[in-house]
Each structure stands twice: as C-alpha cells, then as structure tokens.
Design a protein with these regions (language model features):
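Beta1/beta-strand and adjacent pyrophosphate-binding region of the FAD-binding site
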Residues: 39-51
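Conserved N-terminal/central alpha/beta ligand/cofactor-binding core
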Residues: 60, 66-67, 72-154, 194, ...
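Conserved beta-strand elements of the Class I
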Residues: 44-46, 69, 393
Length: 479
C-alpha cells in the first residue's frame, strides 16, 4: 500500500544510480546540465512553511505593508489543519492581554471541529482564498527550501526546489521566518536547536525527567472508514500485517489523536519510517477487523475511505531564542515585560499507553495524555526569534520552549496567533530598519500598538469557538 519513490530513471544500460541525494543531484546535472536557480527577486519577509502559523505570519506582515514570499512544501496550505492531515484546531483566541489577536486566524480557520473527517471539513479553499487576496504575498506552493545563503550570522537568500518538475528558485530577503514545524530553515542556517526532553535540573521543571533524553511526542496518521450499503473486501494482513488479536486490536472506525507513533524515534531523521509505521498500523487494523475479528460480520459493508499520507506531527526541533519558555512560566505563572499572545491549552504531554507498551515494546502505536492545568499565559516575544541568526523569526511548534512547555504552546490556534505577532514584528523591523532582537530592546512599544489593533477582519462570521472536548468522540479534540 502507498508505495512510492523519489525519482524514476529510464536507462538502456545496466548501470544503477546511487540512492543518496548527492548522487541523484550529480546524475541529474550530468543528464540535464547544471541548473541555476531562477531568481525570484528580493522580499521584505520570506516565510518558510505554509501551515497555520506561516499563513498568519505572511498575512499579518502583508497587511502591514511588507512584500512577502510564502513558501510551502505541499500543494495545499494549512499544515496539520489541511485536508492532507486533518487535525482540528485547538486552543483559544481573542483573549487578554491583546484580545484583538486571533481575528486573523478566524478568517482562515474551518468552521467545524474534529479530527479525521472528510476533506471538505478542513476548508483548504478558504485558507487559499484569503492568502491569494493579499497583493503583497507571492505564494510558492510545492517548493521545499533546500539551501540557505548566509552573510555572517544573517540569512541573505534561500533556494527552494519544486517537487514535481524539480525547478529551483532563489528568494532573497531582509527577514525570514521558520514556520516549518521541524525547524528546517533554522537547522540549515546554523541556529541552535533542541530536540527531546530536558533534564529536570536544567530548568527546575517538576514534570521533566531526571536525565535528558531524545523522547518526543509522536505523530498521528489519521484515517477513517464508513459503513455503506455495499459489501467490500480487503486483503488479509495475516502474512504481512501487524500482530493483532482480540485483545490488542482497536476496532474503531476513526483514528483520533491517541493513534500515535514514533515517540522513541528521531522525528526528523526517521520521519519516513515513522510515517510508514503509522500507515502500517492503520491498514493492519482495518484488515484484521474485516477478515479475522470475532465481530467481522459488523464490518461487511465497512469501507476504508481515507488514510493520511502526511504525518500529523506534534514535536521535533525547537529553535533556541533569547528566552526559553519553561514549565514554571505556565504554572506559577511568571509574567514578562514582552508578553504577547496567550497560550490557553493545558500542558498536554503524551506517552505510550501502558497496555500498548506491554504488547508492543518499543513499537507502540497508542498513547495517553497527561494534562497539567495552567493559568492563561502571555508568551514572551523573545521566544519568537533565533538567538543566533539575526534576521530569523520562528512561529509554530518550533519556537523557543522546553519539551514540557511545548505541551501547551503547540496547538494550532495558539500557533496562529504567534504567527500573527511575528508578522507584525516583521513590519516593525521594516519600518525601523531593525532586526528581530531590536524589537525587544528598543521598539516593543511599536509591536504593542499593533497587537492592540490586530490584523484580522472583524466583519466576517466568527466561527472559532473553543471546545476542550470534541463532541464527536470520547477524546479531546486536538492533542
């Protein structure tokens, strides 16, 4: 199922090309000639990543007068909230101290909640329409940033490659924002990043482990099936599938957030392996229910409608800023002079489900959440720019937080407001001929003025009502 390859080479010789990226690029250059990236010009603000945070960063900056490039490696916008992944939006918007933040997210957010629903549920067209309406945004869909050109500790340009035709483009900019989730831009630019759990002693976090490790929250491969009027068959997984029985199978029609894999793997280096295992579990489960389950007659007319081919990620690299948000900031709470948008989600840590760990040690696929209450907390601006790369912001789940604090800040409505703040900060930088750190040291009052106003429209229907519990299932909506 879902077999794939990166490239097809047709040849009359017995010579086999290598599998590495460098060998592939050398072969392509030899066959097609060297390719110089097409120069797409200079932008005020280059946003890499077209998920919720990237969209909001681009929109906010564009509405405040910046010339913006928005680069997205998929052909749809929305990231985890797109029809490719289908995760609902979590968290609250429009809360103090800057209640105007979030109206921008309301413009692009779907008007329905829930995970793993039909494609229309996630309203990809709504997001795209709002972005295309902004004359200051140039959108590059299907482009992956693969190279970074720096001058000292400043990014000058990026090179991006289009997925299907392998066309290469060059985007120069004064300011950049890493909204990739996995912090790809930051890593290529040499910014310090973290991944995994910090030791308890490093920040004094009571929820942290005694020793640091590489454990992360995992990814969810969403899927669902439906009961139709027509019977159908599905290949029996007895010879190829996951070992399942009446005790270990999870006979559900829809995978929700707790179908989670890859917690013990490297979320960047092992991304393909993690995704494949999640799909393997999905197909194996459906096959077992169709062919060997004791109640398989109930599944006679059940059709597997959709399996995500893109991982719904929660955590990977986090970029280190001038401040690293920690558990105590959220639970005491500790206020900072550079407070911005507010995180409202509880500290939501995921771990392998104990029973599932016993059944599949080291290869778990079910998780459980451990929730720690917080007070609503305004995030410090210093968490939104790199301490190393002078002209790079970040927005989304890759901001400057510990593993524990990420449990609260990672949900998408919060990430959207972070993006809005970053877009505002970029506009202040352009107005003042400043860099991201200068906003904190010198021009924070300018940012405050913008945050009081917001950049979202208030004359459109308000659809982003908060639900801590998903009314369509027995588990929380977006975890």
């Amino acid at each position: 199922f879902d077999g794939r390859c990166d490239a097809v080479v047709l040849t009359t010789s017995d010579e086999m090309p290598g599998d590495s990226l460098d060998e592939y690029r050398a072969l392509r250059a030899r066959l097609l000639g060297p390719e110089t990236p097409v120069d797409k010009g200079e932008f005020d603000f280059v946003v890499v990543g077209g998920g919720i945070s990237g969209i909001c960063a681009a929109l906010a900056a564009a509405r405040l007068g910046c010339k913006v490039a928005l680069v997205q490696d998929r052909y749809v916008l929305g990231g985890n909230n797109s029809s490719e992944v289908r995760v609902g939006l979590g968290g609250q918007i429009n809360v103090d101290p800057y209640p105007s933040l979030g109206y921008l997210l309301n413009e692009i957010g779907p008007d329905r909640i829930g995970n793993a629903r039909g494609a229309h549920h996630y309203q990809d067209d709504k997001k795209l329409k709002v972005v295309l309406a902004e004359k200051n945004i140039t959108l590059f869909l299907g482009y992956t940033v693969t190279e970074v050109e720096k001058m000292g500790d400043t990014i000058r340009s990026v090179v991006a490659v289009e997925a299907t035709e392998q066309n290469r483009i060059k985007l120069s900019g004064k300011l950049f924002s890493d909204c990739t989730g996995d912090a790809y831009l930051a890593a290529m630019a040499g910014a310090e990043c973290r991944m995994g759990r910090e030791a308890r002693a490093e920040f004094g976090e009571s929820l942290a482990p005694v020793e640091a490790d590489g454990f992360t929250m995992g990814v969810s491969i969403e899927w669902y099936c439906e009961d139709w009027n027509t019977p159908c068959t599905f290949p029996d997984s007895l010879d190829w599938g996951l070992r399942l029985d009446e005790y270990t199978v999870e006979p559900v029609h829809r995978a929700n957030w707790y179908w989670e894999v890859g917690m013990r793997d490297d979320q960047v280096a092992d991304a393909e392996k993690i995704r494949d295992y999640g799909m393997y579990v999905a197909y194996s489960t459906f096959s077992y229910c169709k062919n060997r389950y004791s109640k398989k007659e109930d599944w006679t007319c059940t059709h597997l409608v959709w399996v995500s081919h893109v991982s719904g990620k929660r955590e990977s690299r986090r970029v280190v800023g001038d401040y690293i948000l920690r558990e105590q900031d959220l639970t005491r709470p500790i206020r900072h002079e550079d407070e911005t948008c507010t995180t409202t989600w509880r500290i939501d840590q995921h771990y392998p489900m104990e029973k599932n760990s016993q059944q599949y040690p080291g290869a778990e696929w079910l998780s459980e959440g451990v929730l720690t209450p917080i007070d609503f907390y305004a995030l410090p601006y210093r968490c939104f720019y790199s301490k190393d790369v002078r002209n790079m912001f970040m927005a989304g789940r890759n901001i400057s937080v510990t593993h524990i604090a990420l449990g609260s800040t990672r949900v998408m409505r919060t990430c959207g407001m972070i993006g809005e703040v970053v877009g505002m900060a970029a506009s202040v930088c352009m107005k003042r001929n400043a860099l991201p750190r200068d906003i904190y040291t010198t021009y924070f009052a300018d940012l405050q003025e913008l945050m009081r106003k917001g950049t979202g429209r208030t004359d459109v229907p308000y659809t982003q009502f908060y639900h801590q519990v998903d009314r369509t299932g027995h588990q929380a909506e977006d975890r």
